[in-house]
Amino acid sequence: MAIIPGVEQKPMSSNLESRIDQGTGREPADMVLKGGRFFDLVTGELVASDIAICGDTVVGTCGDYKGRHEIDISGKIVVPGFIDTHLHIESSLVTPHEFDRCVLPYGVTTAICDPHEIANVLGAEGLQFFLDSAMETIMDIRVQLSSCVPATHLETSGADLPIEKLLPFRNHPKVIGLAEFMNFPGVIHKDPVCMAKLEAFQGQHIDGHAPLLSGAALNGYLAAGIRTEHECTSAAEALEKIRKGMHILVREGSVSKDLHALMPIITERLSPYLALCTDDRNPLDIAEQGHLDYMIRTAIASGVEPLAIYRAASISAAKAFGLRDRGLVAPGWRADLVVIDTLQNCKASMVLSGGRLVDDALFATRKPVAPVGLDSVKARPVLASHFGVPVTEGETPVMGVLPGKIITEHRRYKLPTDGNQTTVDLENDIIKVAVIERHGKNGNHANGFVQGFGLKKGAIASTVGHDSHNICVVGVSEDDMALAANRLGDIKGGFVVVEDGRVTGEIALPVAGLMSLEPYETVRDTLHTLRKAAYALGTTLEEPFLQVAFLPLPVIPHLKISDMGMVDVDRFALI
């Protein structure tokens, strides 16, 4: 080693020396992908080249390399691993270990998750479970600390996460700052609780959540240091936020589907300020369509330039979250690589995660993490009479479901009555909805009406109810609603479908009432059966279960329901 005068010398790591030697070709590389091309996301070129890998790092391109392990990928294209920049793993209905096994083969090598679903149920215990899991997965799972638990004062959650409970996690190696700051009114109006969290995380990444926020109010929100946004549902909204310095995370989940609406902004010019995310996506949709690869295929088929969408899937995403070691196929960059047939079809035939070939043998090396929250459903039993809605004067507020959106409209109808009770109006597709507190805190029970499910009979119930995850049930029959809600207690959480007094479909989600203990293949198959049971009730929604799950979310406009009652989100108040 050369001695540089005046500079303290430290021993070089053998890994660093190996990377240099293998990159220069003085030593055979640990692994070489031979005969293919890689997609250069800087120049937009497809470059014919070997790709040399040392450990977890690409060390050589644009050359002819020898390797201890050589893989022929002739005719294939290599792209950087995909980064899902905002998701709730709980919405996949499987544990982080099963999510890893389910999604990594599709080329998603990094996932930036907000575990605020389990955090709303279990608090710090839920965060710790995710961090412990992230240390064991093959995929690089990064965790943002849930910023709004509970999301609002308008619902009952199972736990809270004040700043004092977040600070011990702040410097964990898997933590990337503060998760989506949903309480944007609290930011704008300088709520002391919000201010304490924002102050504590200045200089770290703070994720945004500000649907439809615009003008001076948006300026104030961004002045707090918030930089990313996944709630844009129109190109105009996204452009305003890009102009004001935000990175837009284009979302395509199982319910929230914004990809087509945002395609006008997915251009080479704007791609440095774009990334991709799924937010909430279940195993059935992943199996049938894919994950981020589905978004890439769909965008290109609709006319988006490949360079723009592949940048958004990797290098631009990495830069948005300060992950400086990944996102390109280039020397010195992390060997998160996806081998595909064509840019257009984006079908992964091989995936490398940190230089490791992804296969069953690799997944078998992971250490298991014990599940938590196996007794979290503590709701009181309910009767059909608990779902009655007394007659009131004038029109009744009704949530209007928009297919493919989690935004619900605030509609008002003069509903039919039966004696002193307001009843469903099937002619106008209006049925009952209820939220039942399930954390054992107060036994709250609120009833209302929702339009747009298409149900003609029966009931659907869920313990997945964003964000506090109380029981949410929709239905035509009060008897079926009661049976569905009570069955959730028997199976320790999940989804239940009831038709004419009998359970026709269910899935148990005993981990905090949110996730299954079964392999994702079993969950996928069970969801397929559940969908059939829901469709038999007449629902016209492609994904009725996650649609139910978003009805209680009082941070998304315009009308929602919590265990405390109907919520006018625009006024941020109970009706």
Curated annotation (Swiss-Prot):
NCBIfam families: ade. One of its GO terms (molecular function) is adenine deaminase activity. The keyword Kinase does not apply. It comes from the Bacteria. Keywords: Hydrolase, Manganese. InterPro entries: Adenine_deam, Adenine_deam_C, Amidohydro-rel, Metal-dep_hydrolase_composite, Metal_Hydrolase. GO terms for biological process: adenine catabolic process. Its cofactor is Mn(2+). The gene is ade1. This is Adenine deaminase 1. It catalyses: adenine + H2O + H(+) = hypoxanthine + NH4(+). SUPFAM superfamilies: Composite domain of metallo-dependent hydrolases (SSF51338), Metallo-dependent hydrolases (SSF51556). The keyword Manganese applies. Belongs to the metallo-dependent hydrolases superfamily. Adenine deaminase family. Disulfide bonds: none annotated. Its EC number is 3.5.4.2. Pfam families: Adenine_deam_C, Amidohydro_1.
